[in-house]
């Protein structure tokens, strides 16, 4: 399964990040034929990239016990928008603060919706 995680500069709640990723994994489970891999693509900003690295490092042993190889990749948001089909994403997670309204016009969310990819938006 492949999950894209990204957000805005002000997002800084690790607990919400963890919940969002776990829900995305649960929802994407069985969506692809290769459930022996968990690829999390992180398109930033820096704090969300850090959260992704921490999450994968902390859960690596658990996933390994389940026979799942977990990895994360840092990607550029613009590259994801331009080459969305190349990434073969199963679900998209957007993390923001409550006063951020940019997801209404976000290009990644629009691209995901155009490709019938589930999108989850979490605001703190």
Residue spans for each PLM region:
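Glycine-rich phosphate-binding "P-loop"
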Residues: 1-16
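Acidic/glycine-enriched connector segments
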Residues: 12-124
